[in-house]
Swiss-Prot record:
Any matching Pfam family: Cpn60_TCP1
Keyword Cell cycle: no
Organism: Rubrobacter xylanophilus (strain DSM 9941 / JCM 11954 / NBRC 16129 / PRD-1)
A GO molecular-function annotation: unfolded protein binding
Function: Together with its co-chaperonin GroES, plays an essential role in assisting protein folding. The GroEL-GroES system forms a nano-cage that allows encapsulation of the non-native substrate proteins and provides a physical environment optimized to promote and accelerate protein folding.
EC number from the UniProt entry: 5.6.1.7
Protein name as annotated: Chaperonin GroEL
One Gene Ontology cellular component: cytoplasm
Enzyme class: isomerase
Subcellular localization(s) per the UniProt record: Cytoplasm
Lineage: Bacteria, Bacillati, Actinomycetota, Rubrobacteria, Rubrobacterales
Keyword Nuclease listed: no
Gene designation: groEL
Family label: Belongs to the chaperonin (HSP60) family.
Length: 540
């Protein structure tokens, strides 16, 4: 087993702090509307140019093994904030750096790290309460657009995101993809879509678009393979008498059952289309239940004692229209009971809150969106590959920020919400004493750091800006873009409360742990043996 290296006390803490500072200094130049960009080298392909804190943090590995541990801990702050809120990673990094710096300074001066950390935690709790109290709900397209525009530094992006969310609702799915044009386009799919197409091209009704379009169809949802036509005949007769098309969603449709459907379609006897059910295993069952609830039908399954040959029209789902291509099926305006659909949505939301798996969370989110209505796709294009990556990143961040704003509301941007939270922490200082008070004072000082950094990145004096904003009313702050002081909410400079809150909580969590560290254990880098020299082969 390889030996380990250790550092103790001040030496250990200083090494961690150097690592924290190196990462934070690389990230904080990007803060605010006049923040700069960072170029990231890639082993393969062109470099990435970005102003996204978490993307920069993820790329940083330091040579010194002890400093690197400090950098990796700070990286955790950015990553966690990104996971929870999707934005605010640079703010979180700036906050963590100042709490670590001030905390370690006080520990070196003799403060007890554990009591200090208690003070930090109490102050953060008060500040978070103050941020929540400042939050205002957002409604209307304009406010949604402003959140997106601030995050992406682009009004066009803000407007496209607002349009997408307006169409699919706040629970709907909005995907960001690479487009073929130079601008930003929005595509929208109404209704529920799943990624299974027709089982045979003979089902196509629109030859130009190669689509099977069924108007006002019945929908059979069967959790089984259908190959025996005798099982299907009683139901086919009922559907023919009703003079409506039929969509069959089953585990598979094959053999004579599939042949019968195709022959009847080609003869013009009656119109139908068969598709495979989406997903696999347990997830397939859940998705079939979703489709049944959306269309007002039942899942025909042997598990519940329901047999295909005994199925009645009343057990089938209905929809205004179904469009099937070779790759996917879209059900528009399912005839399900709105109350049942709402109940199912709430059930999925409850599952979302309890799941630990990112994969499950993504799949549940997809199911939720399909039930809640529609899928929007934002297609991002650019002149070069490098610009495309950067632009796509900004749109994804802006989308996350907008969702966070819809969830917990908005606060004044530009670091003002954090600065205003100082008042609540200031009141707490009177109740505390000793090292706890010192810990709370560290948070009090940290709350002004983001606004100071935004001002300095814009070429202004941070201390003067902080004093001026502190003396102002509610949401008056420094607009780094114009260089003036104004009502930031009215000017559209706003941040999601969730982003601001998460940035502070995650920064304090990691910084508090760093401050209480006394020993660092690290494994030295193994030296790679030199490559053997390639000499000439021997000759006879």
């Amino acid at each position: 087993m390889a030996h380990k290296e250790l550092k103790f006390n001040t030496e250990a803490r200083q090494a961690l702090e150097r690592g924290v500072n190196k990462l934070a200094d690389a990230v904080k130049v990007t803060l605010g509307p006049k923040g700069q960009y960072v170029v990231l080298d890639k082993k393969f392909g062109s470099p990435t140019i970005t102003n996204d804190g978490v993307t920069i943090a993820r790329e940083i590995e330091l040579e010194d093994i002890f400093e690197n541990q400090g950098a990796q801990l700070l990286k955790e702050v950015a990553t966690k904030t990104n996971d929870v809120a999707g934005d605010g990673t640079t703010t979180a990094t700036v906050l963590a750096q100042i709490i670590v710096r001030e905390g370690l300074k006080n520990v070196a001066a003799g403060a007890n790290p554990v009591i200090l950390r208690n003070g930090i935690e109490k102050a953060v709790e008060k500040a978070v309460e103050a941020i929540r109290e400042q939050a205002k709900e957002i409604s209307g397209k304009d406010e949604i657009a402003r959140v997106g525009a601030i995050s992406a530094r682009s009004e066009e992006v803000g407007n496209v995101i607002a349009e997408a969310i307006d169409k699919v609702g706040k629970d709907g799915v909005v995907n960001v993809e690479e487009g073929q044009t130079l601008g930003i386009d929005l595509e929208f799919t109404e209704g529920m879509q799943f990624d299974k197409g027709y089982l045979s091209p003979y089902f196509v009704t629109d030859q130009d678009r190669m689509e099977a379009v069924l108007e006002d169809p019945y929908i059979l949802i069967a959790n089984q393979k259908i190959s025996n036509v005798q099982d299907l005949l009683p139901l086919l007769n009922q559907v023919m008498q009703a003079n409506k098309p039929l969509l069959i969603i089953a585990e598979d449709v094959e053999g004579e059952a599939l042949a019968t459907l195709i022959v009847n379609k080609l003869r013009g006897t009656f119109q139908s289309c068969a598709v495979k059910a989406p997903g696999f295993g347990d997830r397939r069952k859940r998705m079939m239940e979703d489709i049944a609830i959306l269309t007002g039908g039942e899942v025909i399954t042997e598990e519940l004692g329901l047999k295909l040959e005994n199925t009645q029209l009343s057990q089938l789902g209905r929809a205004r229209k179904v469009v099937v291509t070779k790759d996917d099926t879209t059900i528009v305006d399912g005839a399900g009971d709105p109350e049942q659909i709402k109940g199912r949505i709430n059930q999925i939301k409850a599952e979302l809150e309890t799941t630990d798996s990112d994969f499950d969370r993504e799949k549940l989110q997809e199911r939720l969106a399909k039930l809640a209505g529609g899928v929007a796709v934002i297609k991002v294009g650019a002149a070069t590959e490098t610009e495309l990556k950067e632009k796509k990143h900004r749109v994804e961040d802006a989308l996350s920020a907008t969702r966070a704003a819809l969830e917990e509301g908005i606060v004044p941007g530009g670091g003002v919400a954090l600065l205003k939270a100082q008042k609540a922490v200031g009141e707490l200082l009177d109740e505390l004493d000793g090292d706890e008070r010192t810990g709370a004072r560290i948070v009090y000082r940290a709350l002004e750091e983001p606004i100071r950094q935004i001002a300095e990145n814009a070429g202004a004096d941070g201390s003067i800006v902080v004093d001026k904003v502190r003396a102002q009313g509610d949401s008056i702050g420094f607009n780094a873009l114009t260089g003036g002081y104004e009502d930031l909410v009215a000017a559209g400079v706003i941040d999601p409360a969730m982003v601001t809150r998460s940035a502070l909580q995650n920064a304090a969590s990691i910084a508090g742990l760093l401050v209480t560290t006394d020993v660092v254990v690290a494994e030295p880098e193994e030296e790679q043996p030199a490559m053997p020299g390639g000499g000439m082969g021997g000759m006879m």
